């Protein structure tokens, strides 16, 4: 996948000058993070790491990823409403994975009491890599779907201008014009705004559940600002604040410091380390309320790796999406090989295959946030320890995707520009809103491309491994 700027990657002096221009433009555009040293303050900020050039992406695969996103929205929503499927699918996992078990306990409590909310909001991001076959052909393969705190929609809205600027500096105006416009933050905000509107209280606010130390604040502010432009107010609070000052009235309306809450938007609560006893209490309070949660706990469970693995079983998509054979075909075309590690013959066979050919598999726990997976020798060591234990049921095995590497230059604060062999991961943002049983919004709202050096097996931008990028359609 050659590009017309490949030769510049060998010119150190030109690269240095161009990198400085790109960094200045990124700062001017608001491609920003708080500093690692002081993540609670915006007094000192830095640019978010990014590629100097956009990276080549096959245009047919980009189109395919967009085309299937609304199917994934419908699928996630269907799974979240199917309590029998969730219970059956997660039954082995919750025996050995304490975090998933705690989420499931809250889910069961809310089901027993009766779900109070009538408006349901999904903001998700489906992530893919491009599998490269021996004959050079490429296929879109889903890595995962993020149903909680799907990030970088705000910063991804600001990076196209940076890459257009770089190419314009090089007099590559034709190439610059091919960089797609992209504004996920606007689309994500439209989903929140629709849920807020359907809740039906003009004075109610959106409650954003935030971490105390949040480097990625500007990503979140982009969505907040879009909402404020629509006269919808956002309050940022931590789980601790909800525990201390949140309450439900007799109709289970949620109040935060006497302000009624229409929508709860989680940008925290997706990893075990983000919960203590007080935070679990706060999560239960939020779930019991009639506010629209993004996501509600059923939708968070629908995004687990175990659910992803079960959805790949023959006949399951057909059962969940009856009468929709075209959608089923589009979805199934993106599935990589996924294998259960539940106790029994099927799980034993999967373990044996992975130990025999470790370079072909990835071991995945039920975790979000990046940097949790096991590869190669590390995977072999983990499987040797897990293979005879019921704990293995809290993991899944996935076929390892092998994309075609390409050269690009990675720009990171405090580091010299680095020209390396890279691979990319494409995310498509999806938004849906359901009122009762009626789907009132279902759309794709933009993309995110993240790129990393090939030696890094796992991890995203927040984990310090990948950098922000833009697709250059080829």
UniProtKB/Swiss-Prot annotation:
- Identify the residues that bind substrate: 125, 148-151, 214-216, 220, 267-270, 450, 461-462
Could you tell me which residues carry Phosphoserine?
415
A molecular function GO annotation: ATP binding
Q: Where does Mg(2+) bind?
A: 144, 146, 368
General function of this protein: Catalyzes the production of glutathione from gamma-glutamylcysteine and glycine in an ATP-dependent manner. Glutathione (gamma-glutamylcysteinylglycine, GSH) is the most abundant intracellular thiol in living aerobic cells and is required for numerous processes including the protection of cells against oxidative damage, amino acid transport, the detoxification of foreign compounds, the maintenance of protein sulfhydryl groups in a reduced state and acts as a cofactor for a number of enzymes. Participates in ophthalmate biosynthesis in hepatocytes.
SUPFAM superfamilies documented for this protein: Glutathione synthetase ATP-binding domain-like (SSF56059), PreATP-grasp domain (SSF52440)
- Protein family (similarity comment): Belongs to the eukaryotic GSH synthase family.
- Cofactor needs: Mg(2+)
One of the protein's GO biological processes: response to cadmium ion
Q: Which residues does the record list as N-acetylalanine (modified residue)?
A: 2
Record: residues binding ATP: 144, 305, 364-373, 375, 398-401, 425, 452, 458
InterPro entries tied to this protein? Glutathione_synthase, Glutathione_synthase_a-hlx, Glutathione_synthase_C_euk, Glutathione_synthase_N_euk, GSH-S_sub-bd_sf, GSH_synth_subst-bd, PreATP-grasp_dom_sf
Q: Part of which pathway?
A: Sulfur metabolism; glutathione biosynthesis; glutathione from L-cysteine and L-glutamate: step 2/2
Q: Which GO terms describe its cellular component?
A: cytosol
Q: Subunit structure of this entry?
A: Homodimer.
- Which top EC class is named for this enzyme in its record? ligase
What name is this protein filed under? Glutathione synthetase
Cofactor comment in the record? Binds 1 Mg(2+) ion per subunit.
Q: Per UniProt, which keywords does this protein have?
A: Acetylation, ATP-binding, Glutathione biosynthesis, Ligase, Magnesium, Metal-binding, Nucleotide-binding, Phosphoprotein
Short name of one Pfam family for this protein? Answer: GSH_synth_ATP
Catalytic activity annotation: gamma-L-glutamyl-L-cysteine + glycine + ATP = glutathione + ADP + phosphate + H(+); gamma-L-glutamyl-(2S)-2-aminobutanoate + glycine + ATP = ophthalmate + ADP + phosphate + H(+)
| UniProt-listed Enzyme Commission number(s) | 6.3.2.3
Q: Which organism is it from?
A: Rattus norvegicus (Rat)
